[in-house]
Structures are given as structure tokens and as C-alpha cells.
Amino acid sequence: MAKVRVHELAKELGITSKDAVTKLQELGEFVRSASSTIEAPVVRKLRNAFPDAANKAAAPAAPKAPAPAAESRPAAPAPGPAAPKAPAPKVEAPAPAAPAASAPAAPQASSAAPAAPSTGAKPGARPGPKAETPAPAPRQGGSSQGSSAPRPGGPRPGNNPFATSQGMPRGRGGDGDRAPRPGNNPFATSQGMPRPGRSDGERPGGPRPAAGAGGPRPGGPRPAPGAGGPRPAAGAGGPRPGAPRPGGPRPTPGMMPNRTERPAPAGAGRPGGGGRGPGRPGAPGTGGPGGGGGAPAGGGFGKGGRGRGGTQGAFGKGGAGRGKQRKSKRAKRQELEQMSAPSLGGVSVPRGDGNTVIRLRRGSSITDFADKIEANPAALVTVLFHLGEMATATQSLDEDTFALLGEELGYKLQVVSPEDEERELLSTFDIDVEAELEAEGDEELEPRAPVVTVMGHVDHGKTRLLDAIRNSDVVAGEHGGITQHIGAYQISHEHEGVERDITFIDTPGHEAFTAMRARGAKVTDIAILVVAADDGVMPQTVEALNHAQAANVPIVVAVNKIDKEGANPDKVKGQLTEYGLVPEEYGGDTMFVEVSARQNLNINELIDAVLLTADAALDLRANPDKAARGIAIEANLDKGRGAVATVLVQSGTLAVGDTIVAGTAHGRVRAMFDEDGQALDVALPSRPVQVLGLSNVPRAGDTFLVTSDERTARQIAEKREAADRNAQLAKRRKRISLEDFDQAVADGKIDTLNLILKGDVSGAVEALEDALLKIDVGEGVQLRVIHRGVGAITQNDVNLATVDSAVIIGFNVKPAERVADLADREGVDMRFYSVIYAAIDDIEAALKGMLKPEYEEFQLGTAEVREVFRSSKFGNIAGSIVRSGIIRRNTKARISRDGKIIGDNLTIETLKRFKDDATEVRTDFECGIGLGSYNDITEGDIIETFEMREKPRV
């Protein structure tokens, strides 16, 4: 199926394009305007959203009941005796008469009908069945003179070619004189001269016979008066036989193909139909009150329901009865709002009442805000400019800027939190994780292993404790003995005679990895807080404790390094009591276990304490019989296997071949491995596994879920990526106020250090970025991370650094082949680090080096004026004695008298020792000092010399 545009589909469904675009956006589709193209699945979604409109569009047009019967009728009725009068009861017949009720009217045609030539549809007419118009019944109440006189041909007076009554009126048997011609108004309901012979202005004539049915006549030309069928003379008692007009029939609007109108009930018609005479009541089956016999429902030659003057008019304008098109209520309301809206900065914008709540996503732009309040984005840019902020209409803004704009305009702006944004995103795909958990019954839940996080200060022995638990050696693989990323393992332990599984997550303790440690607290069931017995509570210990308490996670304290000299476990217990962790022996509920990871002491007791806490305080159950849900613990880019993510399954079962989406990455699970590298087919709840097959590297802490198809996973990942990109742009936006803008332009462009970060795992790269962005060395230098990624440094990274003059920072990675040579040729600076301390120190030093130097005044010496010598060549010369320091030539000087500065920013232009020029004069020596053109020198003045020196940065 070819792609269709939104407005085409909206027209097909019978809805407005705006409603279609709004519904598609509510369904989670990215549609910019009504001209956007959408694919077949999206078309089906929109059709399902409007089932009534879709059924109406799919159904054919309502068939016109009389059409098949009319097609089989002869062109003219059979000759018969003329009916002098139409049956009177039919005038009073109700409008919604059945089609069969009008059938007897057909034999009442004029006897002169056979003499009329058969007039069929012209070649240009729209094909369709058409019942020929029979001869009209004789009119009542008129004179009988001239009953069989044919209507003469020739040109007809009047210049309205579309009028239903043309030319001069014919005499009506002398019933009255001709009335004056009313004029030539193409929009009048009665065109041309009125017909004489009606003293009261009305025709009491009976109804015209219908064309065999009361419903609307199918398309086709109607015979023009006097051109086709017979037309009775005015006032005649019988029908007047018509004759063909010389030279062919005159074209009338009735000969034009009728436009398809909405079908009307048979015999109903519409009020105001254009009939042959003004105010003549229509018979059942005709066009309704005033309708012409056999015309479409509503009568007349024009569109149905337009009345006598309902044609397009002489100049192609709208027909009579419509008049000037009125504005809709919405247009009037908008105009009134624009007129009454207060003006700010020369523009008018709609304002709220102070309580109007507007919800925006993170990283929204002024255009998004303008769409919410139906305002012009350019006007909001002007308002923001007058508020002292500079931004473009499509630039992502932070929450503070939106709060400033909303407060000025009377709106309460609410920025959607990441959790709500994620929930709304998944709801567009009919995914509700919280509802799934609430709907699960007890019979569906099965016990699962507890997830334990090891937290604590750096170098307090967390990883070595896990080594003792796993009987492995992980510390040797960490740079500097510091854990750089999260590791997840699962062990089996016999507890009370039962084999129990426990999942451990090791989180780094370095202060730069706060975000990673916080993620570890979000996914865990129990936290083991490791505290060294010799060091006690440290800053990162308190931070880890706060993370665990904020996540409402039970805590088991492991007092490590009890085998070292100076260990004092009681001191640790006393310190932790201040933070709400009271040991059981002190009457609290927190379990403390004294262990030694190096000596392998009390390791089993620690595991038993964890299991006891889990059984006593937690209900660890999950439903394995559903699609998997979980969290990405860590991710990296492997050279041979591609993107590898370590995920923790929290509920459901993850199997090979499932389609998953993790953050901004999506794909199909190609393979799964455990912590020992063994391949797995399925992963049950609380099981950490390595997953292969993702499109890119997800971030540590991103949630993952299994979707029904790959298309859904791709759309979720793309929308997450767009939201994250906008949020990052808003967060990194440099706010420049109008007060600082002129100064920034005068001083030059603000210096920016561009960085490209590459690392071995995504969590380490993100932690490094957060640590670098916290460096603050002043307002004149800005740090900007233009790209970050996982894996080796590639040529694309070097090319990007060349364009943006960036520095590449490699964290536990090296450049790929021939990349180092390319970087040397392009002059790109690449730095490689394995410990985060060195990276932070070097970047901070580089930022300080980019700052403009700051100078401070340094005093050199002072001299007292003893005598003033006047010289015509050099001006006044101060004969002085140096009281302190050194007096140098060409240095800055100032003169003070009685403690007040009388001359500043002077220069010592001449300095002499007796008659010889001197470069400098030291303390207690006499000299002559010349200050150039400055001559206000007297005895007793103090000359102070100084120089500006660059201030060293701390």
C-alpha cells in the first residue's frame, strides 16, 4: 500500500486534518503537519480510532430509489386524454409521500406531449438514468385564450443567462397590464419581468405531475422551457403544445450536469426550492414548497435547497440566499482574544488566569509551548527577549526559563518528570508496567532470589569482599584498585539446609560514580554497607547510606578489616548510630557482621544475615510467566560481539529470540551468557545475564522490556532518544542575559573547551561526564561534551574533533588502527586515562589555562619629595629620597599628599642619580624623578610606584 497523506485520509474519514494530526500524536506517531505521509500500519491505527467515520467512508453513497425505475421508463408518456385539472387532494398530501404514491400522476400528462421531440441527455451531461419530464398539467384559474399558440423563438430580452425565467413575459389573456420590470439583480429570488394575469400576485394552480417518483431526480439535463417539452400558455385551461426553438434550444443552467447532492427523502424536498413561479406549493414527489416538478430535492435548476435565485449568479459568485459568508464563532472568539490580549514588547499573546496549567516535556522549545496556548512562536520569542533571555523558537529551554515565561504570561508550567514521561510514552503503545504488577495474583507469583548491592567508601574492601564470596579475584583487574563499573554475579549458598541463590551487584565507591551507585540502590532488595574498621565512617559511606535509605532498602552492615591493627568495630557502630543504623545489641534492628575479606572471616555469617533480612523484611516474589522486564546494569561495546549489555531480569522470563528495547537501544536477543561466560537460553527473575544483539549501547540504569514486535521496539527507542537529546540540549544551554550580552560581545567570544569522551563501559563514561561538568573555574570558560560513546576511538571521532577543535579523552580505551596517525596529522589532542582522578585534574588545569589572566597591583617602592626642580625641557623634577623598596624607570606611579591621592596612573619617564640616568634606585638613596607632563608636585608629597602582575589561580 502506497503512503498516504494525513489530509487525504482525514477527508476520506470525514474529519478535519487538525483532528487527524492530534489523534496521530496521541497515538504516539511523529506527524508534523497535515501534509505528512503515513504508512499502512499507521493508517489502520487511525481508522480504528475513528470507526464510525471509517464505516461511513467505506459505505457507498445512498442509492436513489427512483433511479432504476426511471431508467426503464419510455422517454415520454403514452398519449392520453388531457387532464384539465390535477386532483385536489394531492395538493394537501403530506410531504413524505411514498414513491409509489406519485406514480398515478404520470398518465395525467398533456395530450400534446407526443408532438414534442424527445429530448435526451446531451453528450456533455453526466451519465445516469433520468426520467423524462412529462408535459406539465394545465394551470388553474387562468384565461383560456391562446391555449395552443406555440411559443415563438428568437432572442429573448434580458441579460442574465442563468436566470430560470428569461425574456419579456407573455400576455395572460388580458387579466391586467404589464408590471414594470423590477430590475436586473442576479441574486433576486425572482428573475426577469413578472408574469401578468395574476391580480393577487399568487398562482392558485394545482400541483404539477411528478416524473414518477417523489425522490430527487438523478443527474442529467432538464429540458429548457420552450425548447423541449410542451409548455402551457399563461392562463390557459389546457396545456400549450411546445415547439422546438429555431436554431436549437437555448442553453440554460438546467442543461448543465447536476452536482451530486445529499439524497433527500422522497417527496420531502427543501424549503425555498426554485420553482417555476414564486410561492407555488409543490406537489408530493416534487421539489417541495415552490419546487419545480421533477427537479432534484429542493427544486430549481441549481443546487438543491438554494431557491429560485440559487444559481451561481451572473458573475460566478455564490447564489442568492447565502449572502456574505459569516465568520464562525471560533474565528470571532480568536479575533476578540487577540484584540483584548495585553501587549508585551509590541506583540499580543494569549494570557492565562494564573491557574492555567501547561504540561511540557523535558527539553521542550518555544514552539511546543506556543502550540499549547495557540500562540505565535515568534511572539513568544519577543516576549522572552524583553524578559532578558535570548532563545530561538526551536531551541530547547530549561525549566527555569519556562517558569519565567509562564509566570509573565499567567500560566503554571509543569515539566513532566522522566518517570511520567516514560509512563506516557509506554502508554501510547498500550504498555502499562504498573498495571501489570497490580493485576498479578498470588497464584502467579513465585519466589525469587534477593538482589544485594555492596556499597561503601572507596578502598574499604567491597570488591575483595565479593571476591571472598565468589572465591574469585576481581580486584586485580581494576585500575588502581578502584572499581570502575558495576559487576553483577549470582551465587548459591546453603542456608538452613536449603540451596538459595543470591544476586550481588558491586558498585564503585569513588565520589565520581555517585550516579552509578544510585542506580545500584534502585534495583536492589538489600544493601550491604561495607565500613573499614580502621577508617570508620567516611564521606562516601554517608552518601551510600543516604542512597539506600532514600530507596527504602534494608541495610546489613559489614565491618571489614577487623584483622588490621587499629581496627575498632565499636567505633564504627557508634558512628553509624548517628545515622539511624542501631545495632541489634544496642536495641536496634540493624544487623552488624564483623568480617575480614582478606582472611575470609565470617563470610558465611554475612550471607546468612542477608538471607535472614530478606526473609524477615521482604516478600521476594515475581511472575516468571510473562514478557521480561528489568534494568540494564552495565553495557559496553565489544570489538567482536558488538553491543553487550548486562541486564538484570526483575520479572518475567527473558529468552533468546525475544525483541527487547533498553533505553535508546533495541534489537533481538541473539545470545545470553552468565557471569562465567556460559550460554543461556532463558533467564528467570533476579538473574543477571549478558545480552547480545542490541543496536547500540544502552546506558547503565536504563529499563528494558520485551515487546511484541521489532517495529514497536524501534519506535520506543527513537522516541526515548529524541526526548533525551532535547533534555540534554536544555541542560547544556548557556543562558546569556541581556546584561551580559553586550559585555560578552565587547570582550570577545566566551571560550569553550570541547570534549569527546570515549570509554570501555557506558556507566564509566557517564560518571566521568558528570564529574567534568561539575568543574567550575569561572564564567569565562565553558565546558562542553559534544560526543560521548563506548568503544575504541575511531576516525569519525578524530574528524569530529577536527571540525569542533575538541580534545579526545579516552577512558580505558585506545585508538583504533591508523587513528593515532590521523590525529597527529590533524593536530587533534588525545589523552588516555585509566583512573578518573588524573582525568579530572588535567581537564581542570586546562580550563584554568583558558581563562583570561587576572592582574593585581604589586607595590615596588615609595619615595618622599624633598625639593622640586623646575626645568624648561623636562618640566618639574622631584628631588626625592627612596623610603622603601625600589624606584624603577617606566613603572606606574601615583602621588599622594596628606594621605590623599592627587595623581594616579602616572609613569616615571625620567630617573636620574645625580646627573646620570638610572634604571632603578634602592632604599635610602636620593634621585630625581620626572613624571612627564604632570607638574603638580610639592615638597612632602609621596611618590608610590607599582606594577600589575598576573594573579596565580588557586
Curated annotation (Swiss-Prot):
Region (G2) residue spans: 481-485
Region (G3): 506-509
NCBIfam families: IF-2 (TIGR00487), small_GTP (TIGR00231)
Intracellular or extracellular location(s): Cytoplasm
Extent of Low complexity compositional bias: 56-75, 88-125, 138-151
GO terms for MF: GTP binding; GTPase activity; translation initiation factor activity
Protein name in UniProt: Translation initiation factor IF-2
Region span, G1: 456-463
Compositionally biased residues, Gly residues: 269-322
Binding-site residues, GTP: 456-463, 506-510, 560-563
